[in-house]
């Protein structure tokens, strides 16, 4: 893989786009059958669910995302003033198509092909992504109707309070947050995947084999296919409009799609219960039970929709209320505890942001973003007060490799 390193401290783990082969794109999307997506579509296709893709922007002219799949969003950082509907890099478009691709004429089909994509660009024309831009993008998405926030990115920078606040803002507004563990094959998971309550997604290959380049750690929650994933990209990136990629970015998008299916199947269900369904119905992908490599296992959208799973009042991955400084296990088999450097973190105060499939850059137009209207689901009880951490110097998000 080609490595790209820019000045800064946040990484985007990406892979080189490869033109798809002559056979139909759908036939190359092995991950859909591996996850049982066709069966899941008999019960839910994601209709009415808004998934925010905080990334490089989303090309709303891509055939598999045209016709209303993508609504105008917003841009932050160097993409400020845009609607997020242009993507000169392809990463955001690829993630959006994995989530909600319409599969036009045998093209890229998403896990939730009737969901709506809300694009949030956090950088333009290859400029550096800042933690501030990512945090602002998350907050904006939550305030503009997102049911699920997809963060196919990770950081190796020092944790910033604004990023932590943004993710907690999502939790407080009943939004499911999904993030990748990273693609360096190391035993370290950066932010935002290491924030307690986030669905931290590692990668698998065919036959439930763990993907060797996934970052691992006690924060890992779920896994999904991450090797040889075919999705749509802008034709300005690959002239066929499709590419094959590796990375936990793709795995993250697939889990976001699964979350959208559950939210559509149970429109009154709170985010905590959606998370609970996804983790309790996952298929063991490594050793029996939860482990640091694939978490609770590979996501199973069909089981998550159809299994008899009790609703819960609070996110089973979140910190339990406590009256002392000692850690208290959360209420429903959370990711195994490690020493905390901050009350809301399970992996120390290191943060990092990696996009796991294609490099994130954006070109956009200056239009005001559309405010999505929807009826909010009942909000889960608020989490206990969170102690703030000292603000570090502003860190920049690097693109480390394709």
Model region roles, listed by residue range:
Residues 1-23, 355-372:
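Secretory targeting and sorting signals
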Residues 13-28, 64, 339-350, 370-380:
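C-terminal region of N-terminal signal peptides and the immediate post-cleavage residues
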Residues 25-114, 143:
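Active-site core segment of subtilase-fold serine proteases
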Residues 79-157, 282-288:
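Subtilisin-like peptidase catalytic core
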Residues 96-98, 226-294:
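Hydrolase catalytic cores
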Residues 123-195, 238-241, 245-246:
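Substrate-binding/access-modulating region of protease and related hydrolase catalytic domains
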Residues 134, 180-197, 202-219, 231-246, ...:
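Active-site-adjacent substrate-recognition loops and nearby beta-strands
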Residues 162, 212, 268-355, 364, ...:
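C-terminal subdomain of the subtilisin-like protease fold in secreted/lumenal serine endopeptidases
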């Amino acid at each position: 893989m080609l490595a790209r390193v820019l000045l800064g401290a946040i990484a985007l783990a990406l892979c080189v786009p490869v033109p798809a082969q002559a056979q139909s794109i759908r036939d190359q999307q092995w991950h859909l059958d591996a996850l049982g997506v066709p069966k899941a579509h008999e019960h839910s296709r994601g209709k009415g669910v808004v998934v925010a893709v905080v990334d490089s922007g989303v090309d709303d002219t891509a055939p598999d995302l045209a016709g209303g799949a993508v609504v105008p969003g917003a841009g932050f950082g160097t993409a400020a003033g845009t609607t997020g509907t242009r993507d000169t890099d392809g990463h955001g478009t690829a993630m959006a198509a994995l989530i909600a691709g319409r599969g036009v004429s045998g093209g890229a089909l998403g896990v939730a092909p009737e969901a709506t994509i809300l694009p949030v660009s956090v950088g333009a024309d290859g400029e550096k992504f800042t933690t501030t831009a990512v945090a602002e993008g998350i907050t904006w998405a939550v305030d503009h109707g997102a049911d699920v926030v997809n963060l196919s990115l990770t950081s190796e920078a020092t944790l910033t309070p604004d990023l932590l606040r943004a993710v907690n803002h999502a939790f407080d507004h009943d939004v499911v947050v999904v993030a990748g563990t990273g693609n360096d094959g190391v035993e370290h998971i950066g932010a935002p995947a290491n924030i307690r309550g986030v669905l931290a997604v590692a990668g698998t290959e065919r036959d439930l084999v763990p993907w060797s380049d996934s970052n691992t750690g006690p924060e890992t929650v779920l896994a999904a296919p991450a090797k040889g994933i075919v999705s749509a990209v802008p034709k300005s990136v690959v002239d066929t409009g499709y590419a094959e990629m590796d990375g936990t970015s793709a795995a993250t998008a697939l889990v976001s799609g699964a979350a959208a299916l559950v939210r559509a199947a149970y429109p009154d269900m709170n985010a905590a219960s959606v998370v609970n369904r996804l983790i309790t119905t996952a298929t063991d992908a490594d050793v029996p039970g939860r482990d640091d490599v694939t978490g609770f296992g590979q996501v199973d959208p069909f089981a998550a929709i159809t299994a008899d799973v009790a609703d819960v009042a609070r996110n089973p991955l979140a910190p339990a209320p406590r009256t002392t400084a000692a850690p208290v296990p959360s209420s429903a088999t959370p990711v195994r505890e490690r020493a905390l450097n901050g009350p809301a973190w399970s992996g120390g105060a290191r943060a990092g942001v990696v996009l796991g499939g294609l490099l994130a850059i954006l070109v956009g137009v200056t239009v005001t973003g559309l405010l999505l209207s929807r009826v909010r689901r009942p909000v889960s009880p608020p989490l206990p007060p969170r102690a703030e951490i000292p603000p570090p110097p502003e860190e920049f998000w690097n693109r480390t490799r394709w």
